[in-house]
A protein has these predicted regions:
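Short, ordered loop/turn segments at secondary-structure junctions
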Residues: 46-49, 75-81, 110-111, 140-142, ...
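Short, acidic/small-residue loops that bind anionic groups at enzyme active sites
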Residues: 69-73, 150-183, 228-235
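Glycine-rich oxoanion-binding loops at beta->alpha junctions
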Residues: 22-34, 82-137, 142-143, 175-186, ...
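Short glycine-rich or small-residue beta-strand-to-loop segments that form or flank ligand, phosphate
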Residues: 40-48, 104-109, 134-137, 202-205, ...
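N-terminal phosphate-binding or glycine-rich loops at protein starts, especially the Walker A/P-loop
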Residues: 34-83
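Short Gly/Thr/Asp-enriched flexible loops that form oxyanion-binding sites at enzyme active sites
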Residues: 55-60, 141-155, 215
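Accessory alpha-helical/coil subdomains and C-terminal extensions
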Residues: 137-139, 147-149, 177-201, 205-302
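C-terminal non-catalytic interaction/assembly regions of soluble proteins
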Residues: 280, 284-381
Length: 381
Protein backbone atom coordinates (compact mmCIF):
# COMPACT_ATOMS: atom_id res chain seq x y z
CA UNK A 1 0.00 0.00 0.00
CA UNK A 2 1.41 3.44 -0.87
CA UNK A 3 2.34 5.88 1.86
CA UNK A 4 -0.44 8.12 3.08
CA UNK A 5 -0.54 11.68 1.85
CA UNK A 6 -2.28 14.85 2.95
CA UNK A 7 -4.94 16.70 0.99
CA UNK A 8 -2.43 19.10 -0.54
CA UNK A 9 0.39 16.64 -1.10
CA UNK A 10 1.06 14.74 -4.31
CA UNK A 11 2.36 11.19 -4.24
CA UNK A 12 5.84 10.25 -5.41
CA UNK A 13 5.97 9.49 -9.11
CA UNK A 14 5.17 5.78 -9.64
CA UNK A 15 6.87 3.85 -12.40
CA UNK A 16 4.11 3.18 -14.93
CA UNK A 17 3.66 -0.27 -16.33
CA UNK A 18 6.02 -2.04 -13.92
CA UNK A 19 3.38 -3.68 -11.71
CA UNK A 20 2.94 -7.38 -12.27
CA UNK A 21 -0.82 -6.97 -11.72
CA UNK A 22 -1.00 -4.50 -14.59
CA UNK A 23 0.94 -6.85 -16.81
CA UNK A 24 -1.32 -9.75 -15.87
CA UNK A 25 -4.43 -7.75 -16.74
CA UNK A 26 -3.27 -7.14 -20.32
CA UNK A 27 -2.99 -10.05 -22.68
CA UNK A 28 -0.39 -9.85 -25.42
CA UNK A 29 -1.88 -8.09 -28.41
CA UNK A 30 -4.70 -6.67 -26.26
CA UNK A 31 -4.75 -3.55 -28.40
CA UNK A 32 -2.96 -2.53 -31.55
CA UNK A 33 -0.05 -0.12 -31.10
CA UNK A 34 0.37 -0.93 -27.40
CA UNK A 35 3.25 0.92 -25.72
CA UNK A 36 4.54 -0.50 -22.41
CA UNK A 37 3.40 1.71 -19.51
CA UNK A 38 0.73 3.51 -21.52
CA UNK A 39 -2.79 2.48 -20.53
CA UNK A 40 -6.28 2.97 -21.91
CA UNK A 41 -8.61 3.58 -18.95
CA UNK A 42 -12.38 3.92 -18.74
CA UNK A 43 -14.11 6.21 -16.22
CA UNK A 44 -17.76 6.46 -15.21
CA UNK A 45 -19.97 8.22 -12.66
CA UNK A 46 -22.91 6.26 -11.25
CA UNK A 47 -25.79 6.80 -8.85
CA UNK A 48 -27.09 10.18 -7.74
CA UNK A 49 -25.03 13.15 -8.87
CA UNK A 50 -23.22 15.32 -6.34
CA UNK A 51 -20.92 18.36 -6.30
CA UNK A 52 -17.30 17.38 -6.95
CA UNK A 53 -17.75 14.70 -9.61
CA UNK A 54 -16.28 16.90 -12.31
CA UNK A 55 -13.25 17.62 -10.12
CA UNK A 56 -12.52 13.87 -9.99
CA UNK A 57 -12.89 13.49 -13.75
CA UNK A 58 -10.65 16.50 -14.32
CA UNK A 59 -7.93 15.14 -12.02
CA UNK A 60 -8.02 11.69 -13.65
CA UNK A 61 -7.71 13.17 -17.14
CA UNK A 62 -5.15 15.86 -16.33
CA UNK A 63 -2.74 13.55 -14.54
CA UNK A 64 -3.55 10.48 -16.61
CA UNK A 65 -2.88 12.24 -19.90
CA UNK A 66 -0.30 14.89 -18.93
CA UNK A 67 1.81 12.90 -16.48
CA UNK A 68 1.43 9.32 -17.67
CA UNK A 69 0.37 9.57 -21.30
CA UNK A 70 -2.68 7.35 -20.76
CA UNK A 71 -5.82 7.49 -22.89
CA UNK A 72 -9.01 8.13 -20.89
CA UNK A 73 -12.41 7.00 -22.13
CA UNK A 74 -15.58 8.31 -20.46
CA UNK A 75 -18.77 6.22 -20.34
CA UNK A 76 -22.05 8.09 -20.59
CA UNK A 77 -24.61 7.73 -17.78
CA UNK A 78 -22.74 5.36 -15.50
CA UNK A 79 -23.04 1.60 -15.90
CA UNK A 80 -25.70 2.16 -18.57
CA UNK A 81 -22.99 3.50 -20.87
CA UNK A 82 -20.93 0.37 -20.32
CA UNK A 83 -23.87 -1.88 -21.17
CA UNK A 84 -24.96 0.25 -24.16
CA UNK A 85 -21.48 0.96 -25.59
CA UNK A 86 -21.86 4.72 -25.08
CA UNK A 87 -18.34 6.07 -24.68
CA UNK A 88 -16.15 8.98 -25.75
CA UNK A 89 -12.49 9.85 -25.38
CA UNK A 90 -11.74 12.49 -22.75
CA UNK A 91 -8.99 14.99 -23.54
CA UNK A 92 -7.38 17.85 -21.66
CA UNK A 93 -9.58 20.22 -23.63
CA UNK A 94 -12.77 18.37 -22.68
CA UNK A 95 -12.16 18.91 -18.95
CA UNK A 96 -11.19 22.58 -19.07
CA UNK A 97 -13.39 24.78 -16.91
CA UNK A 98 -15.31 21.97 -15.22
CA UNK A 99 -13.75 22.23 -11.73
CA UNK A 100 -16.43 24.56 -10.27
CA UNK A 101 -19.34 22.91 -12.05
CA UNK A 102 -21.83 20.73 -10.21
CA UNK A 103 -23.20 17.50 -11.63
CA UNK A 104 -21.12 15.38 -13.99
CA UNK A 105 -20.16 15.99 -17.61
CA UNK A 106 -20.48 12.24 -18.19
CA UNK A 107 -24.04 11.95 -16.94
CA UNK A 108 -25.18 9.36 -14.42
CA UNK A 109 -27.82 6.69 -13.80
CA UNK A 110 -28.82 4.14 -11.19
CA UNK A 111 -28.26 1.25 -13.60
CA UNK A 112 -27.24 -2.03 -11.98
CA UNK A 113 -24.90 -3.86 -14.41
CA UNK A 114 -25.42 -7.15 -12.58
CA UNK A 115 -29.20 -7.02 -12.29
CA UNK A 116 -29.75 -9.40 -15.21
CA UNK A 117 -27.99 -12.63 -16.13
CA UNK A 118 -25.08 -12.00 -18.46
CA UNK A 119 -24.24 -8.59 -17.00
CA UNK A 120 -20.70 -9.63 -16.11
CA UNK A 121 -20.05 -10.85 -19.64
CA UNK A 122 -21.46 -7.64 -21.11
CA UNK A 123 -19.08 -5.56 -18.98
CA UNK A 124 -16.12 -7.72 -19.97
CA UNK A 125 -17.11 -7.55 -23.64
CA UNK A 126 -17.34 -3.75 -23.52
CA UNK A 127 -13.89 -3.42 -21.96
CA UNK A 128 -12.56 -5.64 -24.73
CA UNK A 129 -14.47 -3.71 -27.40
CA UNK A 130 -13.04 -0.41 -26.15
CA UNK A 131 -9.60 -2.03 -25.69
CA UNK A 132 -9.50 -0.87 -22.07
CA UNK A 133 -6.96 -1.91 -19.46
CA UNK A 134 -9.33 -1.12 -16.61
CA UNK A 135 -12.03 1.12 -15.14
CA UNK A 136 -12.17 3.98 -12.63
CA UNK A 137 -15.64 3.85 -11.07
CA UNK A 138 -16.92 6.92 -9.20
CA UNK A 139 -19.99 6.21 -7.11
CA UNK A 140 -21.72 5.45 -3.84
CA UNK A 141 -22.67 2.22 -2.09
CA UNK A 142 -24.55 0.71 -5.04
CA UNK A 143 -22.18 1.72 -7.85
CA UNK A 144 -19.13 0.67 -5.84
CA UNK A 145 -20.91 -2.46 -4.63
CA UNK A 146 -21.26 -3.53 -8.26
CA UNK A 147 -17.62 -2.57 -8.84
CA UNK A 148 -16.53 -4.75 -5.91
CA UNK A 149 -18.40 -7.76 -7.34
CA UNK A 150 -16.89 -7.16 -10.78
CA UNK A 151 -13.45 -6.86 -9.22
CA UNK A 152 -13.85 -10.18 -7.40
CA UNK A 153 -14.72 -11.69 -10.80
CA UNK A 154 -11.44 -10.44 -12.26
CA UNK A 155 -12.49 -7.15 -13.85
CA UNK A 156 -9.74 -4.52 -13.25
CA UNK A 157 -11.43 -1.72 -11.28
CA UNK A 158 -10.40 1.17 -9.02
CA UNK A 159 -13.09 3.04 -7.07
CA UNK A 160 -13.67 6.62 -5.96
CA UNK A 161 -16.25 7.22 -3.18
CA UNK A 162 -19.07 9.65 -3.93
CA UNK A 163 -22.19 10.46 -1.94
CA UNK A 164 -23.65 13.51 -0.26
CA UNK A 165 -24.92 11.16 2.48
CA UNK A 166 -21.33 10.56 3.74
CA UNK A 167 -22.28 6.97 4.59
CA UNK A 168 -19.55 4.85 2.96
CA UNK A 169 -17.74 2.85 5.62
CA UNK A 170 -14.37 2.75 3.88
CA UNK A 171 -13.67 6.49 4.07
CA UNK A 172 -13.96 9.13 6.78
CA UNK A 173 -15.52 11.62 4.37
CA UNK A 174 -17.03 11.61 0.90
CA UNK A 175 -16.96 14.65 -1.36
CA UNK A 176 -20.33 16.30 -1.88
CA UNK A 177 -21.22 16.05 1.81
CA UNK A 178 -19.67 19.38 2.74
CA UNK A 179 -21.57 21.15 -0.05
CA UNK A 180 -24.87 19.48 0.88
CA UNK A 181 -24.46 20.50 4.53
CA UNK A 182 -23.72 24.09 3.50
CA UNK A 183 -26.80 24.21 1.25
CA UNK A 184 -29.01 22.79 4.01
CA UNK A 185 -27.54 25.14 6.63
CA UNK A 186 -28.16 28.17 4.43
CA UNK A 187 -31.78 27.05 3.99
CA UNK A 188 -32.27 26.57 7.74
CA UNK A 189 -30.82 30.02 8.43
CA UNK A 190 -33.34 31.56 6.02
CA UNK A 191 -36.25 29.55 7.37
CA UNK A 192 -35.52 30.67 10.93
CA UNK A 193 -36.53 34.24 10.15
CA UNK A 194 -39.83 33.36 8.51
CA UNK A 195 -40.69 30.80 11.20
CA UNK A 196 -40.09 33.36 13.94
CA UNK A 197 -41.98 36.11 12.10
CA UNK A 198 -45.11 33.99 11.63
CA UNK A 199 -44.92 32.07 14.93
CA UNK A 200 -45.03 28.70 13.20
CA UNK A 201 -43.08 25.47 13.23
CA UNK A 202 -41.12 24.47 10.15
CA UNK A 203 -40.14 20.90 9.30
CA UNK A 204 -37.07 20.77 7.03
CA UNK A 205 -36.62 17.45 5.23
CA UNK A 206 -33.08 16.71 4.04
CA UNK A 207 -31.49 13.75 2.30
CA UNK A 208 -30.15 10.71 4.14
CA UNK A 209 -31.49 7.24 3.40
CA UNK A 210 -29.60 5.19 5.97
CA UNK A 211 -27.44 7.80 7.70
CA UNK A 212 -28.33 11.13 9.28
CA UNK A 213 -25.06 12.99 8.72
CA UNK A 214 -26.61 15.81 6.67
CA UNK A 215 -29.48 16.25 9.14
CA UNK A 216 -27.15 16.20 12.15
CA UNK A 217 -24.50 18.56 10.80
CA UNK A 218 -26.85 21.04 9.13
CA UNK A 219 -29.18 20.91 12.13
CA UNK A 220 -26.35 21.71 14.51
CA UNK A 221 -24.93 24.42 12.26
CA UNK A 222 -28.37 25.95 11.68
CA UNK A 223 -29.51 25.86 15.29
CA UNK A 224 -32.37 23.38 14.80
CA UNK A 225 -34.62 22.68 17.77
CA UNK A 226 -35.18 19.01 16.91
CA UNK A 227 -33.06 16.71 14.70
CA UNK A 228 -34.38 13.31 13.57
CA UNK A 229 -32.13 10.72 11.92
CA UNK A 230 -32.55 7.17 10.51
CA UNK A 231 -30.27 5.66 13.15
CA UNK A 232 -32.62 6.59 16.00
CA UNK A 233 -36.38 5.92 15.62
CA UNK A 234 -38.16 8.95 17.05
CA UNK A 235 -41.03 9.26 19.51
CA UNK A 236 -43.56 11.72 18.09
CA UNK A 237 -44.83 12.51 21.60
CA UNK A 238 -41.30 13.54 22.62
CA UNK A 239 -40.98 15.72 19.51
CA UNK A 240 -44.23 17.48 20.38
CA UNK A 241 -43.16 17.85 24.02
CA UNK A 242 -39.96 19.64 22.97
CA UNK A 243 -41.93 22.02 20.76
CA UNK A 244 -44.49 22.70 23.52
CA UNK A 245 -41.66 23.41 25.95
CA UNK A 246 -40.33 26.08 23.59
CA UNK A 247 -43.76 27.70 23.43
CA UNK A 248 -44.03 27.68 27.22
CA UNK A 249 -40.78 29.65 27.32
CA UNK A 250 -42.07 32.27 24.91
CA UNK A 251 -40.37 30.85 21.81
CA UNK A 252 -43.36 30.51 19.50
CA UNK A 253 -41.66 28.70 16.65
CA UNK A 254 -39.45 25.64 16.12
CA UNK A 255 -37.22 24.22 13.40
CA UNK A 256 -37.38 20.43 13.04
CA UNK A 257 -34.72 18.93 10.73
CA UNK A 258 -35.50 15.39 9.60
CA UNK A 259 -33.56 13.01 7.36
CA UNK A 260 -35.68 11.42 4.62
CA UNK A 261 -34.95 7.95 6.04
CA UNK A 262 -36.00 8.75 9.62
CA UNK A 263 -38.80 6.59 11.02
CA UNK A 264 -40.98 6.75 14.13
CA UNK A 265 -40.98 4.23 16.94
CA UNK A 266 -43.20 1.42 15.71
CA UNK A 267 -46.87 1.98 16.35
CA UNK A 268 -46.60 5.62 17.49
CA UNK A 269 -47.82 7.33 14.29
CA UNK A 270 -48.80 6.74 10.68
CA UNK A 271 -46.00 5.95 8.24
CA UNK A 272 -45.51 6.05 4.50
CA UNK A 273 -46.77 3.24 2.29
CA UNK A 274 -44.57 1.19 -0.02
CA UNK A 275 -42.59 3.42 -2.40
CA UNK A 276 -41.29 2.50 -5.89
CA UNK A 277 -37.84 0.91 -5.89
CA UNK A 278 -34.75 1.48 -8.05
CA UNK A 279 -32.64 -1.18 -9.79
CA UNK A 280 -30.70 -1.85 -6.59
CA UNK A 281 -33.93 -2.48 -4.63
CA UNK A 282 -33.92 0.77 -2.64
CA UNK A 283 -37.25 2.57 -2.14
CA UNK A 284 -37.46 6.13 -3.39
CA UNK A 285 -37.72 8.08 -0.17
CA UNK A 286 -39.40 11.35 0.65
CA UNK A 287 -42.56 12.36 2.46
CA UNK A 288 -41.66 11.99 6.13
CA UNK A 289 -41.66 15.79 6.43
CA UNK A 290 -45.31 16.05 5.38
CA UNK A 291 -46.33 13.33 7.83
CA UNK A 292 -44.49 15.10 10.65
CA UNK A 293 -46.16 18.39 9.73
CA UNK A 294 -49.60 16.81 10.07
CA UNK A 295 -48.78 14.99 13.32
CA UNK A 296 -47.18 18.01 15.01
CA UNK A 297 -50.00 20.39 14.07
CA UNK A 298 -52.79 17.97 15.01
CA UNK A 299 -51.19 17.03 18.34
CA UNK A 300 -50.06 20.51 19.47
CA UNK A 301 -52.45 22.86 17.69
CA UNK A 302 -49.50 24.95 16.50
CA UNK A 303 -49.31 25.94 12.83
CA UNK A 304 -46.68 23.80 11.09
CA UNK A 305 -45.30 23.80 7.55
CA UNK A 306 -42.81 21.64 5.63
CA UNK A 307 -39.89 22.49 3.36
CA UNK A 308 -38.35 19.61 1.40
CA UNK A 309 -34.87 20.58 0.20
CA UNK A 310 -34.70 17.61 -2.17
CA UNK A 311 -32.30 17.71 -5.09
CA UNK A 312 -31.13 21.26 -4.41
CA UNK A 313 -28.70 19.56 -1.99
CA UNK A 314 -27.06 17.77 -4.93
CA UNK A 315 -26.82 20.73 -7.27
CA UNK A 316 -24.66 23.77 -7.74
CA UNK A 317 -21.00 24.50 -7.38
CA UNK A 318 -19.00 22.43 -4.86
CA UNK A 319 -17.38 24.03 -1.84
CA UNK A 320 -13.62 24.55 -1.83
CA UNK A 321 -13.23 21.57 0.52
CA UNK A 322 -15.16 19.25 -1.79
CA UNK A 323 -13.16 20.42 -4.83
CA UNK A 324 -9.88 19.65 -3.07
CA UNK A 325 -11.00 16.29 -1.68
CA UNK A 326 -12.47 15.19 -5.03
CA UNK A 327 -9.29 16.27 -6.81
CA UNK A 328 -7.11 14.27 -4.43
CA UNK A 329 -9.34 11.22 -4.83
CA UNK A 330 -8.98 11.49 -8.62
CA UNK A 331 -5.20 11.83 -8.43
CA UNK A 332 -4.99 8.84 -6.07
CA UNK A 333 -7.20 6.76 -8.37
CA UNK A 334 -5.11 7.37 -11.49
CA UNK A 335 -1.95 6.60 -9.49
CA UNK A 336 -3.53 3.33 -8.34
CA UNK A 337 -4.41 2.39 -11.92
CA UNK A 338 -0.89 3.16 -13.11
CA UNK A 339 0.59 1.07 -10.30
CA UNK A 340 -1.81 -1.79 -11.03
CA UNK A 341 -3.52 -1.64 -7.65
CA UNK A 342 -6.81 -3.03 -8.90
CA UNK A 343 -9.66 -3.76 -6.51
CA UNK A 344 -8.94 -0.69 -4.39
CA UNK A 345 -10.66 2.61 -3.61
CA UNK A 346 -9.31 6.05 -2.75
CA UNK A 347 -10.27 6.93 0.83
CA UNK A 348 -9.76 9.68 3.38
CA UNK A 349 -8.38 8.25 6.61
CA UNK A 350 -7.72 10.94 9.19
CA UNK A 351 -5.99 13.83 7.41
CA UNK A 352 -4.59 11.70 4.57
CA UNK A 353 -5.75 9.98 1.40
CA UNK A 354 -4.86 6.32 0.97
CA UNK A 355 -6.08 3.16 -0.75
CA UNK A 356 -8.42 0.62 0.84
CA UNK A 357 -9.82 -2.52 -0.75
CA UNK A 358 -13.18 -2.24 -2.48
CA UNK A 359 -14.36 -5.14 -0.37
CA UNK A 360 -13.58 -3.19 2.81
CA UNK A 361 -15.06 0.01 1.38
CA UNK A 362 -18.54 -1.44 0.82
CA UNK A 363 -18.62 -3.90 3.72
CA UNK A 364 -20.68 -1.63 5.95
CA UNK A 365 -22.28 1.79 6.02
CA UNK A 366 -20.88 4.67 8.05
CA UNK A 367 -23.70 5.80 10.31
CA UNK A 368 -24.02 8.40 13.06
CA UNK A 369 -22.70 6.96 16.37
CA UNK A 370 -25.29 7.01 19.20
CA UNK A 371 -23.06 9.15 21.41
CA UNK A 372 -22.67 11.81 18.72
CA UNK A 373 -26.43 12.13 18.33
CA UNK A 374 -26.94 12.18 22.09
CA UNK A 375 -24.45 15.04 22.44
CA UNK A 376 -26.54 17.09 20.02
CA UNK A 377 -29.61 16.55 22.22
CA UNK A 378 -28.55 19.32 24.60
CA UNK A 379 -29.72 21.81 21.96
CA UNK A 380 -33.16 20.26 21.43
CA UNK A 381 -36.27 22.11 22.55
Amino acid sequence: MPARRGLGELSPEPQPGTSSSVAASRAAGRREGYVPGILRIGVLTGGGDCPGLNAVIRAVVRKGVDRYGHAIVGFRDGWRGVLDDAAEELTIESVRGILPRGGTILGSSRTNPLKDDGGLDRVRDELERQKLDGLIVIGGEDTLGAAAKLSSAGVPVVGVPKTIDNDLGGTDRTFGFDTAVQVATDAIDRLHTTAESHHRNLVVEVMGRHAGWIALHSGLAGGADVILIPERPFDIDEVCRLIQRRHSRGRYFAIVVVAEGATPVEGTMATLGENPRDEFGHPRLGGIGQILEHEIESRTGYETRTTVLGHVQRGGTPTAYDRVLATQFGLTAIDAVTEGRWGTMAALRGPRVELVTLEEAVAQLRTVPPEEYEQAGVFFG
